[in-house]
Amino acid sequence: MGCKVLVVDLDGTLTLSRNTYELSVEALLALRRARDAGIRVVLATANGLDFALTVARYLGVRDVIAENGCLVHIDGETHELCSGDMSEVDRAVLATGAVAPSHQNKCRRFDLAYVPLVENAVERVKAAVRPGYVVDSSGYAIHVRPAGADKGAAVRWLCERLGVSCGWVAAVGDSDVDAGMLATAWGIAVGNATEAAKRAARAVVRGPSGLGFKEAVDLILSGGACAP
């Protein structure tokens, strides 16, 4: 018996590298191999739900974790794992002058994304945000969301929903915002992952980003990953 579910990050994991948005052909072929083997694939991303669902459609994936775990779309239904109004937080963050809003914020519900304009943008945003919210970086953007929400919490929710032990779920990622799901599931970090992601994972493959994801799928299909 092997992995039943594969949760995979998008940016930096299915892409050619951590500083491009171009998808890796090797990663796409590996994703197809996992699907063909009967593994349920879930796309887990910091991106907004509409964007994530669009990308997932072209990947042949139905289930999505979006906004860093604030939203889960499974079996055609969307579930909110967060609550609250982010407008006041958004105003406080923009008032720092350290970031610019992501174009996706118009359609994001709970996890807001920002483009850093200065080197210490993360620190300045943290200082501006009141307790009860998390500020972190995916390497592509700075994210602010309600405390307690992350990809790890979403994976735990997903496991309960599917009736599957988290030990039978593999997760592959590259960044700090992936650390939660890498620790919750049978985590695999790609070779160029952040130190936080590597520490959280059960295994670290050698290849970077998309090539690393291919190695991760090889490991999964060979029976080298997942345990109850």
Curated annotation (Swiss-Prot):
Name the chemical reaction catalysed here.
2-phosphoglycolate + H2O = glycolate + phosphate
Transmembrane segments annotated in the record for this chain = none
Tell me which EC number(s) this protein carries. Answer: 3.1.3.18
Checking InterPro entries in the record gives: HAD-like_sf, HAD_sf, PGPase
Keyword annotations: Carbohydrate metabolism, Hydrolase, Magnesium, Metal-binding
- Detail which positions bind substrate: 151
GO CC annotation:
cytosol
Identify which cofactors the protein needs according to its UniProt entry: Mg(2+)
Q: Which residues form the active site?
A: 9
Please give the SUPFAM superfamilies that the UniProt record associates with this protein: HAD-like
Which GO molecular function annotations are given, in alphabetical order? magnesium ion binding; phosphoglycolate phosphatase activity
In Pfam terms, one family for this protein is: Hydrolase_3
Amino-acid positions noted as binding Mg(2+) in the UniProt annotation, renumbered to this chain = 9, 11, 174, 178
In terms of HAMAP family, this protein maps to: GPH_hydrolase_arch
Family indicated by similarity: Belongs to the archaeal SPP-like hydrolase family.
Tell me the function of this protein. Catalyzes the dephosphorylation of 2-phosphoglycolate.
The record ties this protein, via PANTHER family, to: HAD SUPERFAMILY HYDROLASE-LIKE, TYPE 3, PHOSPHOSERINE PHOSPHATASE
Q: Which NCBIfam families match?
A: Pglycolate_arch
* Protein name as annotated: Phosphoglycolate phosphatase
